[in-house]
Design a protein with these regions (language model features):
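Start-of-domain marker
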Residues: 26-86
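A mature extracytoplasmic/lumenal domain signature
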Residues: 79, 119-123, 140-142, 168-172, ...
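Mid-length scaffold segments of soluble, non-membrane domains
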Residues: 86-149
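Extended, aromatic/histidine-rich regions of cofactor-dependent oxidoreductases associated
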Residues: 31, 172-207
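Acidic, glycine-rich flexible loop segments
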Residues: 135-172
């Protein structure tokens, strides 16, 4: 009886191990990534029905290049909410004009530097009461070296109070960095971070 119970537990462990690696099918490799977030990012880019990559890029795509995880780039910010609810025209990488407003000012310290960044809310998110997302586009000293020259983005969630956790390890490149058919909001110069934010997705020459 004990042997039977042990056998069942052993089988369950094998099944569970396969599940967290997405697939144990012969010839199918696990999705790359050190964190759940990174694995989700890679899975998204590999999915031909959703990926921003071109068909040619998809053929050779294996995984996104990430900086090493760095807890110092997970920062706590004070969010000063703005009263202005007027949405302004934001230029994009195409002729499209995006509608966004400054939801609040996020004040934080990164590598000893005191920084204030504009946190945006899109008009579509504002109109959809179920959409609690915010948008943080930013520039830093890595742009044009090992990150996209036009800056990177972060998606945030509206906090319950005036405290906001910003994890730059989740920073990603605009989709237009990979495919010009995408229309990406231009990162404002006011959101420049005067340090090297070596966290999140990189952008290498082969991209």
């Amino acid at each position: 009886m004990r042997f039977y119970q042990f056998y069942r537990i052993h089988c369950f462990i094998i099944f569970f191990s396969c599940s967290i690696h997405f697939s144990c099918k012969k010839g199918k490799e696990p999705i790359s990534g050190f964190t759940v977030h990174q694995r989700k990012q890679n899975a998204f880019f590999q999915d031909a029905s959703k990926s921003p990559l071109t068909k040619k890029q998809l053929k050779s795509f294996k995984a996104l290049p990430f900086f090493k995880l760095d807890s110092s780039f997970m920062v706590k910010a004070y969010l000063e909410k703005q009263k202005d609810e007027n949405f302004k025209d934001i230029p994009t990488s195409t002729e499209r004009i995006a509608k966004q407003r400054v939801y609040g000012l996020a004040k934080m310290k990164i590598k000893g530097e005191t920084i204030t960044l504009n946190i945006y809310q899109t008009e579509s998110a504002f109109l959809n009461k179920l959409d609690n997302t915010l948008f943080l586009p930013f520039l830093d000293l890595t742009n044009g070296e090992n990150t996209y020259a036009g800056g990177r983005y972060l998606d945030l969630i509206i906090p319950d109070n005036d405290s906001l956790i910003i994890d730059f390890n989740k920073a990603y490149n605009p989709y237009c960095a990979y495919n010009p058919k995408y229309s990406c909001p231009i990162v404002p110069r006011t959101n420049f971070i005067p340090v090297k934010v070596e966290a999140g997705v990189m952008y290498l020459k082969e991209n």
